[in-house]
Amino acid sequence: GSTEVYTDQWTSMYRCAAEIAGEAHTFFGLQSLAQTDAAVITVQAPGQEGSDRTGLSLPDDQLELLQQTITEAKRLHKHVVVVLNVAGPVDVTAFASDVDAILCVFFPGMEGGRAAAEILYGLVNPSGKLPLTFPAAYRDCPSFGNFPGSAGEVFYGEGIYVGYRYYEKRQIKPAYAFGYGLSYTNFMISDLQLNHDRMDADAAECVHASVRVRNIGRCTGKEVVQLYISDVESTLDKPVKELKGFEKIELAPGEEKLVRFTITRQMLESFDPEYGIWACESGLYRILVGNSSDQISCSADLRVKSRSIYDYSPRTCLKKLYDDPRSRAMLIETIHAVGLDENILADELYYRKFRPIGVVLQNLPNADPKRKEQSYQLFYQNIAKLDLTDC
């Protein structure tokens, strides 16, 4: 539930920094900035369960203090580090370009002061990744047009496009993407390999993916390797890509490790609300590996075979069947079989190309009634047998 805890078991980042660097090298307050190498300022935005923030901006008093610190630091040619003590994303555009580093600790708990101090002094190499997206502007948020709603109710219109899925679908560049996070070292992710480039999902086959990760920096650190999957051309509405796996590994300078993932049918399935089922579509999937949703280092293609409700049937739209040379040839043959010319489809393709083929065929005028039923059923049987793996 929701509660508020008052305790004397908390840590001050200032006191912990003094323990690490010594009292003589640690100063508190803006008036002491001239004696330091860098200014570290903590800003906060309240947030809690059971209520919403009115926006993404930091409180006015926090922004004012932050701006004073930045102005004075620039005058004295000092570095500025901002520690974000927040519940979720905030608008950083007002100051991000004017500071040297941002450490987002969210709500770290009673040892948060010590954890932050140890990171700032290099005793701990940060390795966290954002579990959400920091938008570049509040208006970029998926819910911007719906919040705060009316009469105490908010309409959630994002559907499946929540978080990074929304920003990628709308091609909106965020301030900091889902999965983003820096370290005191650098990593190189390369050489994505699949043990097979085809997968029969109906036979419960799995595909094993491996990728090389190398620490190309000067200190030991941890990297979170993220696996995303994209259905390149799907029938069902889907995000551009979705996170399907991740592994966190520690590497010494120059060290390289092989990170492995297993791709299963479940990773390729999406829920169809119309039919109320999880479905795995046949076709081309792209396997993507990187260290954030917008930093993809390598990719590989996987062809998947699977029988599903999206296989060719009387429900399939005319355009999809006509775009496939195999089913187009079958359709033209069927049109001829009922005594019609293929040009009769011209108007349908221009005005009603997204109609189900079953509706199109039933509405064709002057089709031979004796041949129609048998020819149509044979057509449906033949298109249902087509392998859509390579479509």
Model-flagged regions — what are they?
Residues G1-C391:
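C-terminal non-catalytic regions of proteins with extracellular/luminal or membrane-system context
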